[in-house]
Amino acid sequence: MENLMVIDSVCTYCGVGCDIAANVNVAENKIVNIFAHPDGVVSQGKLCIKGKYGFDFVTSPNRLRIPRIKKTFLEKNPSIKDTIAHSLKEYDAIWFETDLDCATTAAAMKLKEVQEKYGRKSVCSIGGARTSCESSYLFQKFTRHTLNSPHVDNCARVCHSPSLKGMRTTIGEGAATNPYNDIYNCEFMIVIGSNTTEAHPIIANRILDVAREHDNLAVFDVREIKLHRFAKYKAIMPHEANLLVLNMLAYVIIDEELYHENFLHERTKGFDEFKEKILNDPFANPKYFEQIEGYQNLSKMIPKIAREYALKKSMIFWGLGITEHLDGSYAVMAITHLALMTGNIGKSGAGLMPLRGQNNVQGTCDMGMLPYYAPDYQEPKEIGLMTPQLVEEMLEGRVKALLNIGEDIMHIHPNLNKIERAIENLELIFVQELFMTEVAQKADIVVGVKSAYEKTGVYINAMRRLHLSQPLVQSDLPDDWEVLQMLDNKMGGSAEYKNSNEIWDEVREVAYRRFSGASYIRLERHRVRGLQWPVHTEDTPILHQLDFRTEDGLGEFHYHQYKLRGMVEEISSKTLTGYHLTTGRTLAHYNNAAQTKESEKLNSRYDEDILLVHEGDAADFTGEKVILKTEFGQTNPLTLKFTDKVQPKTLFVTFHHAQSKINNLFGDKCDELILTAAFKSIKVEVINT
């Protein structure tokens, strides 16, 4: 077609960060179709269905185009209403429409009032992992410097913060050690707590290619997933047994002296103490599983996996099935221990790969959108509170204003009933979004912004690869950073960036240890290959080749014993009753489905959350639908599907659709160190309807 132009960019969905190209009708300013970039280093000519078909949201009639202010907010704040009255237009019974200048003026007036009344720390900022690095950087800078509040956080809190904590504790860097294509140089692979084919399918393609050719894959999960079909070792675990299994792998490596003595001597510390503790840990011997009915086969399978891992060039992949537990950070440390013991790190075909969830959650953490890290993981001048702590502060009346960018805390966070009570105490909720998500509906002021397919910016994927995106279509909506700059100026700040490039140049100066050599010009020149941080004269595809990024350059062992609890404790004491639930994604949707549900091709595949139940448990499920209930709340009625892919007395459900209210079930149980919610296991009551 005459008006078609092919434009390259990066996929807006998961942390894999696939290279995409789009046929764009320039005359109509419309994406015709999206396909894998033919030379894409990440996508390698393939995209998942979200990448291919999940672009209808860009032109959806449901997009937020004009800023809105809630009428009840203006009734409570008459001086603000008087100031912006000239711009207000009736939208519906709940909202006025206004312009961006007045929306940010109203927000700034209220922010000043809140801080004058309750103090500088009464304001918090949450979000950023769905937007560009430039916007994330400015979000934390505006909050910390202009508002002088230390309270910044992002959705890594509910996903991979334990990976960051665990890896930085042991090897000094909380990111993937290798590029994806190193999978092809790998001799053995362990996947644990990751439904990779559904959540990260383009990485799964590589894993499956190698597994089919070499029969060298071990898969650990609490239910049977697609990867198990291609695995040499098909390990089904009881719920909450990650740390138990990982310590057992380490036990076998130590007991059979399969560790790499030279590597341990030259590049690590603390191994002798670690060795003594693990050999004396009653839970570390794989024979423990001989007494766990239904899982006895693990007692023989775990030693076989440990031997192959130790004696071959090996990689470990993990997802939220590891991190969203009480001991998520400790389990990540246990994963790194395996690599340190065997020297399976710092070289091609051997390493560690946390499979990040959001398209820019790696970049947002790199930008310092965390309460305990400034940009480049430097120590901030003041440590703020993590999101669960901020919710408590809201309930106590000490935090009174929330700034939110693209993080639906009313859908993806735990204990939604508690969060709803907390935000009712706020005097200002200011949200930047694409759609009227659950949190946007609760907002006092909501501003529509550009999507990733409408702007220029840097995104960093799960393998530390920087991709300079470019807009596929043009939009007159503001970028997130432009809204923040307006707020900053009205709050007395001095931000005067002309474009995202100027912000990125500042990032390169502030976070020079990672990005000094990653100019826009260079990123544009290497758009197809991408550059992996740290980027100086050259980039760094493989981390830790000579030293770990700890203070002394040595990897460190930090042993943590498994704590008997949950399903394992119930089975061992023969008191197993009721049902244990775990949650996860499906291929057709992405997290809260705000974008994917706008695509009929995607939503028609999975238009409701479905509860998977073992066939043998059918007698307990007599209704057409069931409600799940815990002490914290209950779901709405859920459709059932009986299958042999989940274990007896275990259930699985996705959480994509807000109307399901899945996260009502979860309370405050969380990772001990980093407060990531324990989404992956909870005991539920079944109510037939």
Regions from the PLM with identified roles:
Residues 476-526, 598-611, 617-689:
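Long, contiguous, secondary-structure-rich segments that constitute the structural scaffold
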Residues 137-208, 213-220, 244-247, 336-445, ...:
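Extended redox/cofactor-interaction regions of prokaryotic respiratory oxidoreductases
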Residues 1-258, 267-270, 274-280, 298, ...:
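N-terminal export/assembly segments and adjacent metallocofactor-ligating motifs
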Residues 32, 259-262, 315-316, 344-354, ...:
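Acidic/polar loop patches that form or flank catalytic/metal-binding clefts of enzymes
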Residues 230-231, 282-286, 318-322, 465-473:
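Flexible glycine/proline-enriched surface loops and loop-helix/loop-strand junctions
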